[in-house]
A protein has these predicted regions:
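Conserved acidic residues
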Residues: 31, 169, 220
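Binuclear metal-dependent hydrolase catalytic cores
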Residues: 1-150, 156
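A short, acidic, amphipathic alpha-helical segment used as a generic capping/interface helix at domain edges
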Residues: 203-215
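A short acidic, glycine-rich active-site loop
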Residues: 193-205
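Short, conserved loop/helix-junction motifs that constitute active-site signature segments
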Residues: 56-58, 165, 214-218
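Conserved small/polar residues in nucleotide/adenosyl-binding loops
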Residues: 225-231
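Loop/turn elements at helix/coil->beta-strand transitions in domains of secreted/extracellular proteins
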Residues: 6, 218-220
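Active-site-proximal loop/helix segments of hydrolase catalytic cores
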Residues: 147-187
């Protein structure tokens, strides 16, 4: 999401960095990453985002806003990549890749509390959604210069997204096709995959429900995400 020259990235699942590279995202302009919840298909590319922003001149640890436990995620990545940080620093030097800049700055988000940021006129409001058994999942309402966008995150249709989406300019809503999932179940080569494909249906919004949310919230432009299953089957 761009607000003036500043960029904010929402979720970084596997494959995100490839897309962002194709978009030629200017990493020095990226102010923060915001995580809706901590399923692997929403955080897997955080380490690559760290590397690209570090190499391209980030001047402080990468800010990551996320639910309770986001500090454990970033600490885990820092531990896993600690040798990598050291190797790159020793190879390229402090002027290029200072160790003081390596790592993350995790900040826990709270329900219905604005996220502080350094972009004039930008408001980012997290709100709780229902992705049980995920015990901390959020959507975001973003306002900038009179325009508003809501990002649902992964959720069932429990009313939260509709409440925050009333009359916004754009709704970005996750949705799954039950028909597609059922067809995938029919050809699943393993019983474990069949079970997973059955289970995921009870904590996502369907395409039909997402359309109803858009209609009832009076939002005409709606962008669907999560339509095809990621490799993690989440």
């Amino acid at each position: 999401m761009e607000a003036g020259d500043d960029i904010y990235i929402f979720d970084l699942g596997n494959g995100s960095m490839e897309n962002l590279t194709q978009y030629q995202v200017p990493w020095p302009n990226v102010k923060a990453v915001l995580i809706t919840h901590m399923h692997s298909d929403h955080i897997a590319d955080l380490p690559d985002a760290h590397l690209q922003s570090w190499v391209q001149g980030r001047n402080s640890p990468l800010i990551v806003y996320g639910p309770e436990g986001i500090n454990l995620v970033t600490q885990g990545f820092e531990l896993a990549y600690s040798a990598d940080y050291q190797y790159r620093n020793e190879h390229h030097g402090d002027d290029m890749l200072p160790m003081t800049i390596a790592g993350f700055n995790p900040i826990q988000i709270m329900d219905n509390q604005l996220i502080p940021n350094g972009t004039p006129g930008l408001e980012i409001l997290p709100f709780v959604v229902d992705h049980h058994p995920v015990n901390s999942a959020f959507g975001f309402k973003i306002s900038y210069k009179g325009r508003t966008v809501v990002i649902s995150g992964d959720t069932i249709h429990d009313g939260s997204v509709q409440k925050y989406s009333k009359d916004v300019d754009l709704l970005v809503h996750s949705a799954i096709s039950i028909d597609l999932v059922e067809r995938m179940r029919e050809i699943a080569p393993l019983p474990q995959l069949n079970k997973i494909l059955f289970d995921i249906q009870d904590y996502h919004t369907t395409i039909k429900e997402a359309g109803e949310i858009s209609r009832d919230a009076n939002v005409k432009p709606v962008s669907y995400t999560h339509l095809t299953l990621p490799t993690t089957l989440q």
